Amino acid sequence: MVMKREVVGYTTMSEHLIDTQLTRSPFFFASANQSMLGCGVAHAFQQAIPFAELANQAKQLLQQAKRDECDNPLLFGIVPFDPKTPTRFMIPRTLYVSSSPRLNRPAHLTRQVAKLISSPSGEQYKQGVSHLLNMFHHSGLSKVVLSRAIEIATEQEIALPTLLRSLLAINHHGYTFAASLDEQRKLIGASPELLVAKRGNYLISNPLAGSRPRSQDAQENAQRRASLLNTAKDLHEHGLVVEEVERIMSRYCRNLYTPMVPSVIETETMLHLSTLLEGQVSDPEVCALQVAADLHPTPAVCGFPRESAYQAIRELEEFDRGYFTGMVGWCDARGNGEWVVTIRCAEVGSHQMKLFAGAGIVDESLPQSELEETGAKMKTILAAAGIELNDVLTA
C-alpha cells in the first residue's frame, strides 16, 4: 500500500485536520519547523524487542513501504522506557505535512472539574528520594530519576483537538505529539527535550537536566535562571547527562562540538539547563533511530550508571512507566529523523487522564524540592486541559 504525502497550509492543519482527523489518526508530531499528521495505517509493528534491534526493525518496515513504490516513506514510532513493553512503529497511508502553526493561547479555556482516582502521597515520594540518598553512600549510583504518576477523572469529556492546540500554543520551540495507544486512549505531550535528530549528514542532541519551576514574576524568574547556572547540584546533575550523551554521540560523529558550559531554556512551567551537541556523521548510512536507540534511556530520564539506575527504579516506583521517559518521533528511508524524550505527557481517554513526571535525584537533592519539581512538570498538561490540582501535586 503506497504512502501518500500531501503538503498543506498550517491553517488547514490546525483548524481542519486536527479537528476532523486527530481522534482516529495514529499520530501527530510537531517540531518548531513542521507538523505531521498521519491518516490510516499502511504498515505497522507492535512487539517488545531489545532497543539494539529497533533500527533494523524500522528499516524492514520502511523497505516494505518502498516496495510499494514509495520513494522515501516515513515511519512514526513510540518506544517505551523498558524494552519489556511493546515498541510501536507505523507507516501511514496518508501523511499530511505543514509548517508548524503559531497558535495563540486560547482566550477562554474551559475549566475542567476533575477528581483524583489514584495518587501516591507526597510523603511516599519523598521517602523514595531519601532511600536513594542513602543508597548513593554505599553503591556505585550517581543519579536516579524517580518518577510518580497520578490518575484523574473529569466530569466533561476531554476534547483532544483542543488539548493538542493548547499544547502547540505554549510549546513553539519544543515537540508536541499525540500517538494512539488503543481505540480509547492517546499518548499526548509537549516535550522540550531532543534526544537526537539527523538531517542529512548532521546529528544534533539537546539533553536537559537540572531544573527549576518557572516563575511568572520576571525578577524572581531571573534569579532562578541565575541559580541554575550557579548551583553545584544542578551543574553536577547536568554534567552527568552531557558526558554520557557526548560519549555515545562520539561513536557516530566527527567534529562533534559540545559547549563547555550549559545554557538555560524555558518552557511554560519549567527552567532547564540545556546543552546542544552538534556533529557530522562519520558514516552517512547511519540512521537517526540507530543513534537514538544507543542513547536511550539517557541519564536525564533513567540515571547513571544505566543498569543500576534501572534496577533502583524498578524497586522504588510502584507503577509501570509504559511510554513515559521513552522516546517518540519519526525516521525516513534515507536515515533522517527526529526522536524526542517522552516527557511532559499523559495517557488521555475521553474522561480520564494519567499524568507522569520525574526528577533527577543526586547526592545533593532535597526530597521536598524534588517533589515540587514533579508537580510543576505535571502542570504543563493540566494547564492545557484547563485542570487545576495544585494542592495535590506537592502534598
From Swiss-Prot:
For biological process, the GO terms are: vibriobactin biosynthetic process
Q: Does the keyword Isomerase apply?
A: yes
Q: Kindly state which keywords UniProt assigns to this record, in alphabetical order.
A: Isomerase
Please write the reaction equations for the catalytic activity of this protein: chorismate = isochorismate
Cystine links in this protein are none
Which Pfam families does this entry report, sorted A to Z?
Answer: Chorismate_bind (PF00425)
Q: Which InterPro entries match?
A: ADC_synthase, Chorismate_C, IsoChor_synthase
- The source's domain of life comes to Bacteria
Q: What residue ranges carry the coiled-coil annotation?
A: none
Q: In which pathway does it act?
A: Siderophore biosynthesis; vibriobactin biosynthesis
Mention one GO molecular function. Answer: isochorismate synthase activity
The EC designation for this entry is 5.4.4.2
The family assignment reads:
Belongs to the isochorismate synthase family.
Q: What is this protein called in UniProt?
A: Vibriobactin-specific isochorismate synthase
Q: Which gene encodes it?
A: vibC
